Amino acid sequence: AMMRKEPRPGQKQEGMPAICGDKAESVSLPKTLVRIGKYGFYNCEKLRKLTFWSSIRDLGAGLFTGCRGVEELDVWMEEEKKSCLPEVLAELSQTLRLTIRDQTGAVTAKLLIPEFFEESVENTPARILVLETHGCGHRYRYCFRQTQMQMPEYDALFPYVCVEEQPETAAQLAWYRLWYPSGLSESSKKQYKTYLKEHPEVYTKLNKTAESFFVELQKIVDESGRGYQGNH
């Protein structure tokens, strides 16, 4: 939706100032919102987090054009309704931390969605441009069935992350799945725990920025029972 400009000095205005450009860092959208027009967050360069309900029915084209800083999505899911989450993810190609909540606000899953980017490469003999995709993030953006996230499909993509992404990315993705094991099978749990045990060097790097992250991660990797689900 288009935002009105801020008033000139001395000019009166009603309501809140425009939320646009470098002023928006975190935006929370109401449950009653059903439509966002084209280029709704155009050039919100400092936007980092977006909280929204999955029931938004219409998202305009170019919704996040110029929003390369978005790094966190917090979505409240409405049961038995079409979800807009796949469309939102399709508009953002960067690495994203995704929190999924039920209608009461309780966290049901925390996921890491890796990045991807596309580039046009010239095929000189054929005189055509070939679109090449880099990174495994595009695969994660298709882990949906009838707009609902499919955890088994998400977990099945972990081998791609291990090959194409940095160890820190793979470790954080694994930690999220162990911390919130919604739909996590025993075989998938094993693959995540095995990766963390085989890459102890990531503990040191992660510990520099989040000591609690390190402590809880170590507990999960060392335990032999079920994954722990915290209250966040």
Language-model features, listed with the residues they occupy:
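Structural detector for tandem alpha-solenoid helical repeats, activating at a conserved register
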Residues: 35, 212-215
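Structural signature of tandem-repeat unit edges
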Residues: 1-13, 20-35, 45-58, 68-187, ...
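Conserved hydrophobic site in ankyrin repeats
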Residues: 217-220
